[in-house]
Amino acid sequence: MPTWLASPDDPLPDTRHALPAGSEVPGLVAAGTDLSPRRLAEAYARGIFPWYSAGQPVLWWSPDPRMVLPVAEFKLSHSLRKTLRRFSAAPHCEVRIDHDFAAVIHACATTPREGQDGTWIQPELQAAYTEWHRLGAVHSFETWVDGRLLGGLYGVNLGRMFFGESMFSHATDASKIALAALVAFCRANDIALIDCQQRTAHLGSLGAREIDRPAFEGHLARTVAQRPPEDWTYHRSHWTQLRLDTGPDPASSSVTEISLRPAAP
């Protein structure tokens, strides 16, 4: 039975109390209270995250199974590999980290998505993650072409663990480029797992898979207390982590043609 948190001092419950698979709201473990950095840090360290709609109290979740992306298992399709090779070689194309976090989280909250009428990133959540970003725990990976932000993602870092939150794309493959950059950064910094929270076919096609809650929480216990990466700068040398030079040479079309093509509505 989910726990009602009446006060910011109320502790989050044991995740074993989360509603089970097959219930009306599987994974729901608690409701209520605040979104302070202290509360968020407590939650994420235990594999719990907030997710709710307008008009609802803050809802806290710990799904079982859990969708994760082992960075060693990231799948690069032939077309994405070609795009990344062109992108990484072009001086007017770059990945930036934390250059415009506010724009990234705003775009994640407002970009229309197929099959969704609204957003789960409520204004209170935007404010909470922005505050946590200022404290150094939340980061954005951003796809820039010719000085324009075309896609990106943001997520939480605790120790040697990264929790993906949301992504957006305003041009074909722009969010995939940001995700590939995150994977490369994680490989370079001994972060083995990216939390994806819940299953989607899109993430599954990129190598994400489900693990049970005990396995996920065991990984957190080993990683979140470690020293986090110190340098949150994306260097072009990070692309070598993806071994983009393998396979046939890409066709000669320009990066600008690929990266500035508008995304399908």
UniProtKB/Swiss-Prot annotation:
Residues 244-265 are annotated as: Disordered. It is found in: Cytoplasm. Pfam families: Leu_Phe_trans. InterPro entries: Acyl_CoA_acyltransferase, Leu/Phe-tRNA_Trfase, Leu/Phe-tRNA_Trfase_C, Leu/Phe-tRNA_Trfase_N. GO terms for molecular function: leucyl-tRNA--protein transferase activity. Signal peptide: none annotated. One of its GO terms (biological process) is protein catabolic process. SUPFAM superfamilies: Acyl-CoA N-acyltransferases (Nat). NCBIfam families: aat. HAMAP family: Leu_Phe_trans. Belongs to the L/F-transferase family. This is Leucyl/phenylalanyl-tRNA--protein transferase. It comes from Methylibium petroleiphilum (strain ATCC BAA-1232 / LMG 22953 / PM1). The lineage of its organism: Bacteria, Pseudomonadati, Pseudomonadota, Betaproteobacteria, Burkholderiales.
